C-alpha cells in the first residue's frame, strides 16, 4: 500500500550539552520525500514534544495535509500556527471513540489520561498489521478532568490483535 500517516510532530528542547541551540527538530526527510503518500497527521495531545515541529513540517510540505486532533489540542495547534504565520491549515477535530479512514489505514481514537486534557491514543489498522500508540498517559483513577484511560478500548484492540505497541509515559508523575 502507498499510504502513510504521521503520528505526532514534536520537538525536543536542548539540555545543557547543546549551548546556543533553541530547538531540536526531527528529521522529516523521509516524510518529505514521500509526501504524496501522506494521508494525514494525527496528534495525540497538545504538549510541545508532540506538536512543536508542526509549523516547520507544514512549511516544507508542498500541499495541505489534514491534521487530526481533539478540540483542545487543535486550539493549541491553531495558536502555534498563527505564531508562525501559517494560514488555512486543514485542521480536523476528532473525538475519542471515533474512527477515520486515511487511505488504506484506519485510525481509531481512544481516551487516555495525561497531565493535559484532550489526550488520546490511536489504534492504527493497516494492511501490514495493527499498531497501538498510547500517546502519553498516566494511570490515574481519579483524574481532575474526569477522563480516564479507556481500558475497554485497549481490551478490544488486544482481542483484535496488536502487532506493535508504541507508548510513552512522560510527565506520568504530574
Regions found by a protein language model. Give the residues of each.
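His/Asp/Glu-rich metal-coordinating catalytic cores
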Residues: 1-42, 47-171
Amino acid at each position: 500500500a502507498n499510504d502513510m500517516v504521521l503520528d505526532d510532530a514534536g520537538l525536543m528542547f536542548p539540555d545543557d550539552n547543546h549551548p546556543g541551540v533553541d530547538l531540536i527538530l526531527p528529521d522529516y526527510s523521509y516524510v518529505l520525500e514521500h509526501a504524496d503518500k501522506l494521508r494525514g497527521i494525527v496528534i495525540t495531545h497538545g504538549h510541545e514534544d508532540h506538536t512543536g515541529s508542526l509549523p516547520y513540517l507544514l512549511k516544507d510540505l508542498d500541499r495541505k495535509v489534514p491534521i487530526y486532533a481533539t478540540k483542545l489540542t487543535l486550539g493549541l495547534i491553531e495558536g502555534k500556527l498563527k505564531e508562525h504565520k501559517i494560514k488555512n491549515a486543514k485542521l480536523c477535530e476528532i473525538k475519542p471513540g471515533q474512527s477515520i479512514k486515511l487511505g488504506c489505514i484506519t485510525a481509531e481514537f481512544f481516551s487516555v489520561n495525561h497531565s493535559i486534557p484532550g489526550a488520546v491514543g490511536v489504534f492504527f489498522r493497516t494492511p501490514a498489521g495493527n499498531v497501538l500508540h498510547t500517546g502519553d498517559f498516566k494511570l490515574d483513577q481519579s483524574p481532575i478532568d474526569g477522563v480516564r484511560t479507556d481500558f475497554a478500548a485497549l481490551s478490544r484492540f488486544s482481542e483484535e490483535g496488536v502487532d506493535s505497541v508504541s507508548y510513552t509515559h512522560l510527565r506520568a508523575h504530574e
